[in-house]
Amino acid sequence: MKTVTVKDLVIGTGAPKIIVSLMAKDIARVKSEALAYREADFDILEWRVDHFADHSNVESVMAAAKILRETMPEKPLLFTFRSAKEGGEQAISTEAYIALNRAAIDSGLVDMIDLELFTGDDQVKETVAYAHAHDVKVVMSNHDFHKTPEAEEIIARLRKMQSFDADIPKIALMPQSTSDVLTLLTATLEMQEQYADRPIITMSMAKTGVISRLAGEVFGSAATFGAVKKASAPGQISVNDLRTVLTILHQA
């Protein structure tokens, strides 16, 4: 299986990499939170642009991205606008969503973009090609904050992302029971062993799914999300605790 290298970070080998989400509402908070995050122990900085009040103003968005880039130049920067339909803060039209991601790609400030699988097949394929032409990696994602589908459906979605040339397919699902967590882990293992030719990220959310955020190295998930301050999704634990557990499991 091939790995994905962003800056000096190799994703897809060793312990799962830790991603943290910055969810500031304005430029001033972007700056103050970036300074606070700089002291934390993580690998990838995700900027959740759907929390940014002025997200429709591309100049303002890129000014904030520049602050993040300058504050943490060594950290890979993942640009994410999570749509309302997948659990994000803001609704956005497909056209505006694609335009915003293209502007991020054009800026030269971001290393990776998050692209939602169900944006529309043609738009997704075109945006992936555009990102790759500009040396930007694509995390292709799908989120369900209500349920966990069958393992076959989870695998089908991850394989579709792979067929669309995502650098890293990602899926996050809400368990209704402990058996749903097992379904997610089973699907992750099967995908990793039988189909994946690149790193994947999977997680089962909420308190019930916490084990999935810790056991990625065992089942085949290459990264996990931790919280520096406020969690960006239910079930996230602090980066310090997360690093401790991931290191213990890696060294066992």
Swiss-Prot record:
Q: Which PROSITE patterns match?
A: DEHYDROQUINASE_I (PS01028)
- The residues that hold 3-dehydroquinate are 21, 46-48, 82, 213, 232, 236
Active site residues of this protein = 143 (proton donor/acceptor), 170 (schiff-base intermediate with substrate)
* Entry-linked InterPro entries: 3-dehydroquinate_DH_AS, Aldolase_TIM, DHquinase_I, Type-I_3-dehydroquinase
Tell me which UniProt keywords the record has, alphabetically: Amino-acid biosynthesis, Aromatic amino acid biosynthesis, Lyase, Schiff base
Transmembrane ranges?
none
EC number(s) in its UniProt entry? Answer: 4.2.1.10
Q: Which Pfam families match?
A: DHquinase_I
Cleaved signal peptide residues: none
Q: What are its GO biological-process terms? A: 3,4-dihydroxybenzoate biosynthetic process; amino acid biosynthetic process; aromatic amino acid family biosynthetic process; chorismate biosynthetic process
Reaction(s) this enzyme catalyzes, per UniProt: 3-dehydroquinate = 3-dehydroshikimate + H2O
- Which GO terms of the molecular function aspect are on file? 3-dehydroquinate dehydratase activity
Q: In which pathway does it act?
A: Metabolic intermediate biosynthesis; chorismate biosynthesis; chorismate from D-erythrose 4-phosphate and phosphoenolpyruvate: step 3/7
Q: Assembly and partners? A: Homodimer.
What's this protein's function?
Involved in the third step of the chorismate pathway, which leads to the biosynthesis of aromatic amino acids. Catalyzes the cis-dehydration of 3-dehydroquinate (DHQ) and introduces the first double bond of the aromatic ring to yield 3-dehydroshikimate.
Matching HAMAP family: AroD
PANTHER family recorded for this chain?
Answer: 3-DEHYDROQUINATE DEHYDRATASE
Q: Which family does it belong to?
A: Belongs to the type-I 3-dehydroquinase family.
- Please give the name of this protein: 3-dehydroquinate dehydratase
Native organism is: Escherichia coli O8 (strain IAI1)
